[in-house]
């Protein structure tokens, strides 16, 4: 009997003690109520049972081995839902909160050989009629509930839907005719269906695989992009949508890639068609470079050009009449001549035939012959000997003079070399022997430059209007020359020393120093206020340069999992780091580097810079430039002219631009005015000395680009110089109208002060401001007080562009002889945080962000997806950039984070999602601080 109980317990998955409590104890109660005889009969049975039962370990909750999965009813075919759990005494299905009848369950039960626990598997069948009979907003769903002695466990919900696929596409592709290498976009929105249809594209009935042909790209919302149209891309394209129910094809869109014809080069001019007189010449070209294809336009213009020509007629030469016979000569002949000039041959005409000279005997053969005289021969021999002797004497004298001069020349060279310490030989007199402190080493010498190099500007380039300089004078250039023996030339000023050195040597020194400055590592900035460093992993973070408007957002997931990068962002203030500017171009942002260069990124980082361009982009052509490894500046993208191949995206806000890039490099934003209405913002800041013990008092008016970093640099400079801010800085719109900036001072109390300005105003040339290449550009007004007792200064400063806008500053300051503390309120001392890492760097919590991406990345039939989010956030200028990313919503939210850093306006984001019909309550809770 005990064996039977154990077998029953094993089959049911129950412990022996539990089974005995359930079966034996009630039997004992019944037996005790019967007679004693019956009790005596069963004594043997109870004597066989132990007095106490061992306690089995507690049974675990049921664990689902198989949970029901979502299913689709195709046509009228029912679907089966399966569920398996262990240990489980019972499993039932609950559909739409109602229990499914026991008879509708198909149960399979077995014992796991390893654990000895009961494994129960249940299935039910769902018909189309059951699903259609459900009323309400929620889809038909079912879930399993499993029991054991320890309790119950519920499975996940499995939704059962009726599968279908509409016949009509919501948007079908349209045929296009495009030129060669143009980007092509074919749009397709598949029919509504459950489950959502998968989309593929056919090219002439062949499936397009973007992996095999990288010229094709299929976006996340099913559009087909041909990056650069080729002749082979001329074809019929079809959008195919399919799911488990059906397969639909859109109408065919024909893409024709045409080639406009181009002229070949002109052939050579033909010869004039007239051999005598007026005619014409012609040259031809053909429309074959390239020839028009697929309906491309034929070449415009003429294929033949003709010009008039005149060919001079040939003139044959004719003889003039014979001249008279000459007198009879010693040889008893006389002659006569004629010329071929009546007319002379011209333009290819024939020359005259015959003799030019004609001679004949003039004595009729009676001429006398004389023998040569011996005296004449002796005379000729004497002359030859005399000439030979003279030539020999001349050669000897010349050789002697040459050797003497050659020895003197070598001596001069040695002396010159000694004076110059091994430099190029120059002619220096003996009176200048005091130039060297010790005798130089003539065997080895070298030149070394010590000290800073400054650009040499002509005085005529400055603003010639007052004795108060607009720009502070540059320090003198000092150069030392060292030789191998340690002798040093005295420190002369630039003009004197340049006269001793050759121009080539001076230029070489300057160029070498500039090259050394250029090759310095970008990450080793000496000024920590211009650089931010940080260590980041896949959680991302933020790098901020305080008070500069420059930051770098590293989104979560941008750095590959398992990698750690030492990243930096730095502002370059040296002029040799700025890109070259053309006439109408201007620098709109500081030059900023981010690194490390070449780092592998899996999604774009966002570099934020303050810019000084007026928001009206129609007057601007704004382009992003980056500096290559060789130091050359290259164009990256023009705002408004992006295409599929552009590596960066620029979001231009009113005061900042956000650069989305996967390439860490050196960047700058350059603007080119397309109209004279284009304007850039200037920041006008006025400074004066913190203390003044003399009669003169200088006021400096800075005209800066309206960026935080430009003002920060001037504030730091003035703090070092002991200056103070006299008035709150003001902005000025400076138009590209080629008009100068005019500065003037008014309403001075003449009984206390007098201006040393000779003219009524000062002007800064237009191009000095517009190019943006001159840092810390300022103008100085020097006032003189008539007495040291005068401590109050009241005046007005007017700064305006000629025929443009202006600003007026009302100054009312106290002149102190004792220095006081420098107060620069525009530099926020609390802004010392440069690095924020991990989730704390972002406003949107990571779980909420993941939910938003999963719900908005997939295209929706009503458009309530990432495209509408971009439109609501005003980030929809070029949606194709986001469409090429694996998670468009994630990139849009990254850009929103960069725009709203550091505050983060989550309530605004929640309101946008509410307008889209996305009731993201978690975002609302986070906006209210309840997350």
UniProtKB/Swiss-Prot annotation:
Disulfide bonds join 83-144, 95-142, 188-239, 272-309, 276-313, 287-299, 328-362, 332-367, 340-352. Residues 530-673 form the ZU5 domain. Residues 694-712 are annotated as: Interaction with DCC. Proteolytically cleaved by caspases during apoptosis. The cleavage does not take place when the receptor is associated with netrin ligand. Its cleavage by caspases is required to induce apoptosis. Phosphorylated on different cytoplasmic tyrosine residues. Phosphorylation of Tyr-568 leads to an interaction with PTPN11 phosphatase, suggesting that its activity is regulated by phosphorylation/dephosphorylation. Tyrosine phosphorylation is netrin-dependent. The record marks 415-416 as: Cleavage. Residues 260-314, 316-368 form the TSP type-1 domain. Residues 161-256 form the Ig-like C2-type domain. Pfam families: Death (PF00531), I-set (PF07679), TSP_1 (PF00090), UPA (PF17217), ZU5 (PF00791). The chain crosses the membrane at residues 381-401. Residues 41-380 are extracellular. Residues 850-929 form the Death domain. Residues 62-159 form the Ig-like domain. InterPro entries: DEATH-like_dom_sf, Death_dom, Death_UNC5C, Ig-like_dom, Ig-like_dom_sf, Ig-like_fold, Ig_I-set, Ig_sub. Gene3D superfamilies: 2.60.220.30, Death Domain, Fas, Immunoglobulins, Thrombospondin type-1 (TSP1) repeat. GO terms for biological process: anterior/posterior axon guidance; apoptotic process; axon guidance; brain development; chemorepulsion of axon; dorsal root ganglion development; ectopic germ cell programmed cell death; netrin-activated signaling pathway. It is found in: Cell membrane; Cell surface; Synapse, Synaptosome; Cell projection, Axon. Its main location: membrane. Glycans are attached at residues 236, 361. It is a single-pass type I membrane protein. GO terms for molecular function: netrin receptor activity; netrin receptor activity involved in chemorepulsion; protein kinase binding; tubulin binding. It is linked to Defects in Unc5c are the cause of cerebellar vermis defect (cvd) and hobble (hob) phenotypes. Cvd and hob rats exhibit cerebellar and midbrain defects, possibly as a result of abnormal neuronal migration, and exhibit laminar structure abnormalities in the fused cerebellar hemispheres and ectopic cerebellar tissues in the cerebello-pontine junction. Interacts with DCC (via cytoplasmic domain). Interacts (tyrosine phosphorylated form) with PTPN11. Interacts (via extracellular domain) with FLRT3 (via extracellular domain). Interacts (via Ig-like C2-type domain) with DSCAM (via extracellular domain). Interacts (via death domain) with DAPK1. Interacts (via cytoplasmic domain) with TUBB3; this interaction is decreased by NTN1/Netrin-1. Belongs to the unc-5 family. Receptor for netrin required for axon guidance. Mediates axon repulsion of neuronal growth cones in the developing nervous system upon ligand binding. NTN1/Netrin-1 binding might cause dissociation of UNC5C from polymerized TUBB3 in microtubules and thereby lead to increased microtubule dynamics and axon repulsion. Axon repulsion in growth cones may also be caused by its association with DCC that may trigger signaling for repulsion. Might also collaborate with DSCAM in NTN1-mediated axon repulsion independently of DCC. Also involved in corticospinal tract axon guidance independently of DCC. This is Netrin receptor UNC5C.
């Amino acid at each position: 009997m005990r064996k039977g109980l154990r077998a029953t317990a094993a089959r049911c998955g129950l412990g022996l003690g539990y089974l005995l409590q359930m079966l034996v104890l009630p039997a004992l109660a019944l037996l005790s109520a019967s007679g004693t005889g019956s009790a005596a009969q069963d004594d043997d049975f109870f004597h066989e049972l132990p007095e106490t039962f061992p306690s089995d370990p507690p049974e675990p909750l049921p664990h689902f081995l198989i949970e029901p999965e979502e299913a689709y009813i195709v046509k009228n075919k029912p679907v089966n839902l399966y569920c398996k759990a262990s240990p489980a005494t019972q499993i039932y299905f609950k559909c739409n909160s109602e229990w499914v009848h026991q008879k509708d369950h198909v149960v399979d039960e077995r014992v796991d050989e390893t654990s000895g626990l009961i494994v129960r598997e249940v299935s039910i069948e769902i018909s189309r009629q059951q699903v259609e009979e459900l009323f309400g907003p929620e889809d038909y769903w079912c879930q399993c509930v499993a029991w054991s002695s320890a309790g119950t466990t519920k499975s996940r919900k499995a939704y059962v839907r009726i599968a279908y696929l509409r016949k009509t596409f919501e948007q079908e592709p349209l045929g296009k005719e495009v030129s060669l290498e143009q980007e092509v976009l074919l749009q397709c929105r598949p029919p509504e269906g459950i489950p959502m249809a998968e989309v593929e594209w056919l090219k002439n009935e062949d499936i397009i695989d973007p992996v095999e042909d990288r010229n094709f790209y299929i976006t996340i919302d099913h559009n087909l992009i041909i990056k650069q149209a080729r002749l082979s891309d001329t074809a019929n394209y079809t959008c195919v949508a399919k799911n488990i129910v059906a397969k639909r094809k859109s109408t065919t869109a024909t893409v024709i890639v045409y080639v406009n014809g181009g002229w070949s080069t002109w052939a050579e001019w033909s010869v004039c068609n007239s051999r005598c007189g007026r005619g014409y010449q012609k040259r031809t070209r053909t429309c074959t470079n390239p020839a028009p294809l697929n309906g491309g336009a034929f070449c415009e213009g003429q294929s033949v050009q003709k010009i008039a020509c005149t060919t001079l007629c040939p003139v044959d030469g004719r003889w003039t009449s014979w001249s008279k016979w000459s007198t009879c000569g010693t040889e008893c002949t006389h002659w006569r001549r004629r010329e071929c000039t009546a007319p002379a041959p011209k333009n290819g005409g024939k020359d005259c035939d015959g003799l030019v000279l004609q001679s004949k005997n003039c004595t009729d053969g009676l001429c006398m012959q004389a023998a040569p005289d011996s005296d004449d021969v002796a005379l000729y021999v004497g002359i030859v000997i005399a000439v030979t002797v003279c030539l020999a004497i001349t050669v000897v004298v010349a050789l002697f003079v040459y050797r003497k001069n050659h020895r003197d020349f070598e001596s001069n060279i040695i002396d010159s070399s000694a004076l110059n310490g091994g430099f190029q030989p120059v002619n220096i007199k003996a009176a200048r022997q005091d130039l060297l402190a010790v005798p130089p080493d003539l065997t080895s010498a070298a030149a070394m430059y010590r000290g800073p190099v400054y650009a040499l500007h002509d005085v005529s380039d400055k603003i010639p209007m007052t004795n108060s300089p607009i720009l502070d004078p540059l320090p003198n250039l000092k150069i030392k020359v060292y030789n191998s023996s340690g002798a040093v030339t005295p420190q002369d000023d630039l003009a004197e020393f340049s006269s001793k050195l050759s121009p080539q040597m001076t230029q070489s020194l300057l160029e070498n120093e500039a090259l050394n400055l250029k090759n310095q590592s970008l990450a080793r900035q000496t000024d920590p206020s211009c650089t931010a460093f940080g260590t980041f992993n896949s959680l991302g973070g933020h790098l901020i340069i305080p008070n500069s408007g420059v930051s770098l957002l590293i989104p979560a997931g941008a750095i590959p999992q398992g990698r750690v990068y030492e990243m930096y962002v730095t502002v370059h203030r040296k002029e040799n780091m700025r890109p070259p500017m053309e006439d109408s171009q201007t620098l709109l942002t500081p030059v900023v580097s981010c690194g490390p260069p070449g780092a592998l990124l899996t999604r774009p980082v966002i570099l934020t810079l303050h810019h000084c361009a007026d928001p009206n982009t129609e007057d601007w052509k704004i382009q992003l430039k980056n500096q290559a490894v060789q130091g050359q500046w290259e164009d990256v993208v023009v705002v408004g002219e992006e295409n599929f191949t552009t590596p960066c995206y620029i979001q231009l806000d009113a005061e900042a631009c956000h650069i989305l890039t996967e390439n860490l490099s050196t960047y700058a934003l350059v603007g080119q005015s397309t109209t004279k209405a284009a304007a850039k913002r200037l920041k006008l800041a006025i400074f004066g000395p913190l203390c003044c013990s003399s009669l003169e008092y200088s006021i400096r008016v800075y005209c800066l680009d309206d960026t935080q970093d430009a003002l920060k640099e001037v504030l730091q400079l003035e703090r070092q110089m002991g200056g103070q801010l006299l008035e709150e800085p003001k902005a000025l719109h400076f138009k590209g109208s080629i008009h100068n900036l005019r500065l003037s001072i008014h309403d001075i109390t003449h009984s206390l002060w007098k201006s040393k300005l000779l003219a009524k105003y000062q002007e800064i040339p237009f191009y000095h401001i517009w190019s943006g290449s001159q840092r810390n550009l300022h103008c100085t007004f020097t006032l003189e007080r008539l007495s040291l007792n005068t401590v109050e200064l009241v005046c007005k400063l007017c700064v305006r562009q000629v025929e443009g806008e202006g600003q007026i500053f009302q100054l009312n300051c106290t002149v102190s002889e004792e220095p006081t503390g420098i107060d620069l309120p525009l530099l926020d001392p609390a802004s010392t945080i440069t690095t924020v890492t991990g989730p704390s760097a972002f406003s949107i919590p990571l779980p909420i962000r993941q939910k938003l991406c999963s719900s908005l990345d997939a295209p929706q039939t009503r458009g309530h997806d990432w495209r509408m989010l971009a439109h609501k956030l005003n980030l929809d200028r070029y949606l194709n950039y986001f469409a090429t990313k694996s998670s468009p919503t994630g990139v849009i939210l990254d850009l929103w984070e960069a725009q709203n850093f550091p505050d983060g306006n989550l309530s605004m984001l929640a309101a946008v999602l509410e307008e889209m019909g996305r009731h993201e309550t978690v975002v609302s809770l986070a906006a209210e601080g309840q997350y």
